[in-house]
Amino acid sequence: MYWEHAYNFWVKVYALTFALGVVSGITMSFQFGTNWPGFMERTGNIAGPLLGYEVLTAFFLEASFLGIMLFGKQRVSNRTHLISTFLVAFGTSLSAFWILALNSWMHTPAGYEIRDGQFFAESWAAIIFNPSFPYRLTHMMLASLLTSAFLVAGVCAYRIQKGVDGPATKMVLKSGIYTAALVIPLQILAGDLHGLNTLEHQPAKVAAMEGIWETQKGAGFTIVGIPDEEARETRFAVKIPNAASLILTHELDGEVKGLHDFCLLYTSDAADEV
């Protein structure tokens, strides 16, 4: 009884967030053509099918069963309604799968060849399950679950404070807290593995994110600062000593490659190509 009462409240919240997701998703689809036409012109043979898979397998699944979940409780059996609810959740997760597959491929492209300036698929398995995809998908799914847990816990705590729906709200509050307690250590582990994967495949990006200009051992973690590209330094930087090396290499004196070395490397490679 309590769970049903909680469901009737939270399904309304889900319906609102789903509507916002649809609106923002449609806008994003148009942005691929309006903001990045050059990118789509060259990678459309890969990006287009991945976006199409998301619509055909995920969005249609969500849209088909969302109506039953929202409005069919009194019109279908409890089992059918339960299955519809789980299928909507599965469709949402499947949507994240395809979107993050494309996003990850943009970071760590694989399974393609370039002909006449166009990207063509050689292996869809390699494209979808590219080097950063498992880490990014796990990290994002855990982040979504953690965000939901804190949202649920926060709203329930507010409702309890206002004296609304005591027993049911307390039960859901506990579930939110327990979920967060379970997911937090998993997210820390997933985030660490994702960071190590990024360091392996995109070390220049890591150096840029951390504001590490020169290759160094015992690199500090910059909390705040103002990057100066001409001087190649971060002015007024507030750092935690050795923290960047500890996070990225798991050693206090681990070596982290700096942006200056990448500039020299890429400049040298470009000169060799010319």
Model segments located where?
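Aromatic-rich transmembrane-lumenal/periplasmic boundary elements in polytopic membrane proteins
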Residues: L102, T179-T249
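Membrane-interface interhelical connector segments
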Residues: L252-L265
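Internal alpha-helical transmembrane segments
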Residues: G67-R75, T80-F86, F97-W105, I128, ...
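Membrane-interface helix-loop junction between the first two transmembrane segments
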Residues: M1-A6, N35-W36, Q161
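Functional transmembrane-helix hotspots
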Residues: F30, T34-G38, I99-D116, D192-M209
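Membrane-interface helix-loop-helix modules in multi-pass inner-membrane proteins
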Residues: T17-L87, S104
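Short aromatic-rich membrane-water interface segments that cap or initiate transmembrane helices
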Residues: R42-Y53, A121-M140, S268
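Conserved small/polar residues in nucleotide/adenosyl-binding loops
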Residues: Y266-E273
